[in-house]
Every structure is written in structure tokens, then in C-alpha cells.
Amino acid sequence: MQIREIHFCEVCGSPYVELHHVVYRSENKNLENCKLNFVYLCQEHHRGTYGVHGSKGARLNRKLKLEFQNKLEELLDKQYLTREEINNILQIDDKALNRLLKRFSIQDYKYIKEDIIRACMDGKLIM
């Protein structure tokens, strides 16, 4: 018998949740299966008026994206990282990782931290 993980809404703590991709799949399909890109939200905070997909949800969407960006800043703890180090953090399949990194030049088999974060954020860093 497998024990199921219990998740709660990141905003209000409700136990009735839906999986949300912080960086939308339409923005960056490469992170579709990256657990760092997942948050759990109740129906109201996911699809409600003030939810991330709602007509007045821009503030919450921006907040979650900034938290994701900050998490990447923290986990990508060196200025230059190898492909393996990046994959250990993002834990995405090889094909997705190749697509994510293909447009960047490497120096001594390493990628620049800011380039990686920018790629994960669909080219838009939150300031």
C-alpha cells in the first residue's frame, strides 16, 4: 500500500488543492515535470477571480513566480554550473534539459547561473 502525500493550498492552507505550474506550461514546457515549479493551490487561488488564472490574479501570479525565482537563486548556489549539477537541481528529463540549455554557450563545460534562471523563467526575471 502506497501512502499518498497530503498537500495544502500555499496561500490559505485549504486541504482541497489543484497542482499549479508556477511558470506555466505554455511559458516553458521544459519545466512541465520539474517539482520545483509546482505549487498546490485551492480552487479559489488557482482559478478564482483573484487566483493565478483569474482576471485579477496578476499579483498572486507574480508573487509565486518571484518565490520560484528566489528558490532557483538559492539552489543554483554557484556562478557556473555543469549540466549534471543543473539536472540534479531541476530533476527534468534529458530532452527537456537539452532544450532548456541549447541556446547558451558554455565555458569549460559550465553554464552561467543567471542564464539558467532566465531560461527557467521564460526569459523574464522578476525584479
Provide a role label for each language-model segment:
Residues E84-L90:
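Short alpha-helical "recognition helix" segments of helix-turn-helix
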Residues M1-E18, V39-E44:
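Short cysteine-rich loop/turn motifs with clustered Cys
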Residues K102-M127:
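Short Lys/Arg-enriched helix C-cap and helix-to-coil transition segments
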Residues K63-L81:
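Short, amphipathic alpha-helical "recognition" segments used to contact nucleic acids or chromatin
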Residues M1-F8, N30-E32, N70-L72:
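Short, charged surface segments at domain edges that flank catalytic/cofactor-binding sites
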Residues L97-N98:
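Helix-turn-helix DNA-binding helix
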Residues V23-F38:
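Short linker/helix segments within small regulatory modules
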Residues N37-R62:
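Short Cys/His-centered divalent metal-binding micro-motifs
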